[in-house]
Amino acid sequence: MFSSGMILGMAVAAQPAFAQEKMEVVQVTGTRITTPGTNSNSPISSITAEEIKTSQPVAVEEFFKGLPAAVPAIGPGTNNGTGGAATIDLRGLGTNRTLVLVNGRRLVPYSLGGTVDTNSIPIALLSRVDIFTGGASVAYGADAVSGVANFLLKKNFTGVDLTTSYGATTEERDAKRRRTDLTIGANLADNRGNVVLSVGKTVADPLTQGAREYGITSLNSVTGGPTGSGTTVPSAFSTSQGPGGTATLSGSWQIDPATGKLVSPAQLYNTNPLNYYVTGLERTQATSMGNFKINEHAEAYAELFYTNSKVASTLAESGTFGNTFNVPIGNPFIPAAARQQLCERRGIPAASCVEGNATVVPLLVNRRFVELGPRYNDFDNKTLQYTMGMKGEIGYDWTYDAYWSRGNADQTQTRRNWGSLAKVGQALNALNKTTCVVNTNGCVPLNVFGAAGSITPAMLAYINQSALLLQSVQQDVGSLSVSGDLGDKLVSPFAGQPINMAFSLEQRKVVASTASDAASQLQGEVLGTGAPTPDRAGQFKLREAAVEMAIPLVKDLPLMRAINLELGYRQTEFSSAGKSQDYGSWKAGGEWSPIQSLRFRAMAQKATRAPNVNELFAPQVTGLSNLAVDPCMGTRINQAQANTAGTLSNLCRLTGVPVSEIGSLPAPSSGQINNLSGGNPALGPEEAKTKTIGFVWEPMPKLALTVDYYKIDIDKAVSSPTTTDILDGCYNTAFNPGLVVNASCGMIGRNTINGTFNGNESKGVQTPQSNLGTQNTSGVDVNVAYRLNVSTLGLDSKYGNLDLSWGFNQVQSYKFRPTPSSIERDCLGFYSVACGAPNYKRKFNQRTNWTVGDFALGYNWRYVSGVIEEPGGTDFLPAFAKIDAFNYVDLSAVWNVTKMLRLNLSVNNLANKKPPIVGGSIGTTGTDSGNTFPQSYDAVGRYITFGASLKF
């Protein structure tokens, strides 16, 4: 929705080697070497501060989402996603493989997964963002596998800058957002020092799926019709056949309030209206920076970043979610007609089939607590990071930079209106309407057998349950780097320029933990959570040493204007859980410039990423995964073949489907199933090899073209099989021809009562972590930038300049294999439960800016190619199994009224394009929401933002 679609600026990438007459010494993202000029042997591009201002984002991730090299990550645009965190994913290899830096230094991760929340980056102070997509483990550390996003802040700011913006949709006038930033800076001691303070406040309203016609009703991805959750109202029930009981009432049945009878099929509950397309946000930021030059050899500096973001997300009302309770057949709230049916099913004699009888029935209950209202997840995220350092010149053109940094990220999550499993069980064990059989803790008998409204406020007050979860991450980083050249004694005779080198030492320690209240630590006790959240803690240390070299080989010879070599190596010692491992990362590459306007470049790198705290120490817990069709559901199997070896019916029985449920097993509730996953302390580092080759061409002044091919191969990847892999490995004859119980079948844990993957009695599908995976991607990046005066078009030069840019990404392959026994899944051009959100073959942004004096107009065209549902799986509705190419157009306008006052206007999704509709279970739980992919497509609509900036 709010993606700016910024084109990567080409000022960095487009300059040929050593083309400047004056050698400016700078440091380039991707290396710690300070070299003349701003050249890189790997693809590197920039987003300027002006581009960021023009698009008026309220969060950093917004202008990243539209970049060709970026893949939308789960974030604020996903219901029940990341607790308000905004992350970056380059090349689609995962947010944990993209390194985020501020001024070349690490930020503390917000989670145990090692991912940085970009909400903590102050937009008001951004000077430039460098995106390095060639791997940078040698320069910055093991986790820079797919690339680096380096946010460079303004230096030595003076004066006052007050910026504010307000935005809303043009049709419904909702999803409002307000942002205000105040920045103050001043020089000290005859300009020897500078201090800056920037504070900001952002408030963004949430947008519910019920606010859009395409999101208000949950749609079945197979049939296209309305669907929902089996946890419904009136309640749905099922129970196993008892001794002497009848075969009727298999499957799920619902009480008809008019007759009191159990009828089938049960009506599903629409969970969409209360869920979010966009999560609301209240964020407060404060950033302070200072530097002071003590002498020519020492400049002290310090930075402090503080962010407090509060997010209140909602989910559909809580309920019993298919848990089984021991309910007396004489529970007074059971209608007489339904009681009679249950007695027949269980074989209970007529004498006992009366109100007040204590004979227990194991009853699977699916009651939605609509009387309780929505579930709330309140997140309070606090990040504090401070850095102290010293830098300066050593002598002989060598410089140093030493710093220490500590960051803390703390999250408090409060769950409200979720309900207690134990209290529901106690309240259902009642023989009259006023007291429970176990009448402790103020127990109030619960009526789950009536229509909406049958649960009274007193009942709700008893069964209600809130929960508290705490998370803390602390990161300490100590770093020393020195760089310079080796002088004119050790030079190539064909170049005459010194070798530039950089040495760096770094020590990093990450300590992380979670804690929760007693209720949260019990499996299923907090209704609707699906998993316990036991306390956990872990830490790891890294000690690293690196060396980099830039070696000029040839200069100013025929067809060899410049040939340069770049080498680097990083040695890492990784320590965790009392064990240590040593491994290395390296890079080798160079450039050849035959003429001034043309430069070829290539780089090969090996990156080694250590597993993060979550991958190592996360406990094994039961969560949720999407699944539209259970291989054993409905008439796919039959009781006649239940004992016939080699049949699907027999295999379903052997993997946990009771014979009485064969032929009537319902579809997964809400299109979701239980999924057992967790960390693995035995994990080792994964290895990635990155290759890039390309060229930079400036055929004429102010026109630049870059073309780069990239290939990234990850071995020993930390990965886990998808639920689809496990289910196919067991039930699909392509992988299990004999339909016998195999290793995949051993990872399946069905509900012991009804055979589904839902309810507290089901562990679900196990997806363990290992180092057995592989992942690779390759493609081509093309960037073009051209600036021309309109006089070249035959117009008067007073009509200003046109800036044209085009950024294009063609992905050639995108494959992964989580284990050797899994299939190698090629997700390019597909979306599915296994592949996740759409994986585009092509993306491009075309941006045109027209500047006339104090006015500027901007036009941005964003394109993503068409995708289809991954073949070979569930037969989804054809209309949902294909998404055509999408085009978005954004506009912007700037008026510099005076030197002090600037006015901005931006319009995103000018044509008010609606998102593609795919239903609710065709993708993963995190990406497929509100019948679409809201992180990949605009689910909000045309959005207009007004802004103003005052400087003095």
Predicted segments with their positions:
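Short loop/turn motifs that connect adjacent beta-strands in outer-membrane beta-barrel proteins
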Residues: 21, 156-159, 173, 189-192, ...
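N-terminal periplasmic "start-of-domain" segments of outer-membrane beta-barrel proteins
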Residues: 25-55, 82
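Surface-exposed, low-complexity loop segments enriched in small/polar and acidic residues
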Residues: 83, 112, 205-207, 213-220, ...
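Short acidic/polar hinge/loop motifs at secondary-structure boundaries
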Residues: 105-133
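C-terminal beta-signal and adjacent terminal beta-strands/loops
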Residues: 422, 704, 812-815, 862-872, ...
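C-terminal beta-barrel architecture of Gram-negative outer-membrane proteins
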Residues: 623, 804-896, 911-912
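Extracytoplasmic beta-strand/coil segments of soluble accessory domains associated
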Residues: 65-105
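N-terminal periplasmic accessory domains that precede
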Residues: 60-63, 67, 86-89, 117-122, ...
